[in-house]
């Protein structure tokens, strides 16, 4: 009948249109030529032949400090002018190689060098600029991040108001110490680690937080960050046993949290051993990312002994711990 015929013709038109969109590179090229703004990943732009004949007036690359040199060059060669946006004091490029293959270690180390950092350190004058106002964090948290990681510049905190949470029991920055708790040491699991005492302390804090928020009928986003996959799995398992109506919780590793933000961040250190071995937690950039995700409240859970002597040249937890005990107005050590 006429109705079926109409729907069939409509279907044929849509099918032809879809085929043109998915298969006709010339059709894609015409659309792209008329576009003022195109979004892509660094490597994704090389996946389409239509970009081979296009030169952009501007190429803006976000999170440029995390990209390897080859990844950055893919979009950079397609632009007349380049803007790189990033933070070389946060996570570096990540390259996956077989750690046991000695022949690849030199290549791996080379690829993990940040072109963004190299350019930042070598370029002078008006060719680079530093953003000096942060709009994410409460001023107490922002001041700490500025002092610990960006002391060479004065970063202004925005006037945006951030409310206080659990202000009688906690400060905007709190460290819950597990050193005096039984069984506070880490447990190895394959190549990863977990810490049951830190998981217990985290659940206790979430209970307190949810109870406090329920009194005011307010919901908050919570990010729980761990440097180790075994701890992430443990935390995920423990959190799933509870139902907190006023908490929207995300649990992930440090790498997954870069670029994200939550009202409250809980950072689970995990490492706690007699040798005071920090593993890759000794990388200050990873700690910077973890601590700077918080908007209103930052809670660190772990053994304060990590802030003492370690067999490494650098221990980023030492100056963090010293800042906390030196600023009782904004910070609190809970033992």
At which residue positions do the language-model features occur?
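Conserved helicase NTPase catalytic core signature
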Residues: 1-58
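Conserved helicase motor core of SF1/SF2 NTP-dependent helicases
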Residues: 43-335
């Amino acid at each position: 009948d006429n109705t079926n015929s109409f729907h069939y013709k409509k279907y044929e038109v849509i099918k032809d249109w879809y085929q043109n969109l998915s298969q006709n590179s010339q059709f894609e090229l015409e659309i792209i030529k008329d576009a003022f703004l195109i979004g892509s990943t660094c490597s994704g732009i090389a996946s389409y032949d239509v970009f081979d004949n296009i030169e952009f007036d501007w190429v803006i690359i976000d999170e440029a400090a995390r990209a390897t040199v080859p990844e950055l060059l893919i979009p950079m060669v397609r632009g007349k002018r380049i803007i790189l946006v990033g933070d070389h004091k946060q996570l570096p490029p990540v390259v996956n190689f077989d750690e046991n293959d000695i022949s690849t270690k030199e290549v791996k180390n080379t690829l993990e060098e940040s072109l963004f950092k190299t350019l930042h350190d070598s370029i002078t004058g008006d060719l680079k600029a530093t953003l000096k106002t942060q709009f994410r964090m409460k001023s107490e948290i922002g001041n700490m991040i500025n002092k610990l990681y960006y002391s060479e510049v004065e970063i202004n905190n925005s006037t945006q108001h951030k409310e206080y949470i659990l202000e009688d029991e906690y400060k905007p920055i709190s460290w819950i110490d597990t050193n005096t708790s039984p069984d506070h040491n880490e447990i190895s699991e394959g190549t990863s680690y977990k810490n049951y005492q830190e998981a217990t302390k985290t659940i206790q804090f979430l209970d307190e937080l949810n109870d406090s928020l329920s009194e005011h009928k307010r919901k908050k986003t919570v990010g729980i960050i761990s440097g180790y996959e075994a701890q992430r799995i443990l935390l995920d398992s423990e959190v799933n046993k509870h139902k907190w109506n006023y908490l929207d919780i995300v649990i992930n590793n440090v790498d997954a949290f870069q670029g994200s933000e939550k009202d409250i961040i809980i950072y689970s250190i995990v490492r706690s051993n007699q040798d005071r071995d920090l593993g890759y937690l000794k990388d200050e950039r990873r700690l910077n990312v973890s601590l700077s995700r918080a908007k209103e409240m930052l809670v660190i859970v772990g053994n304060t002994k990590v802030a003492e002597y370690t067999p490494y040249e650098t221990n980023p937890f030492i100056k963090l711990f010293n800042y906390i005990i030196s600023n009782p107005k904004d910070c609190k050590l809970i033992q």
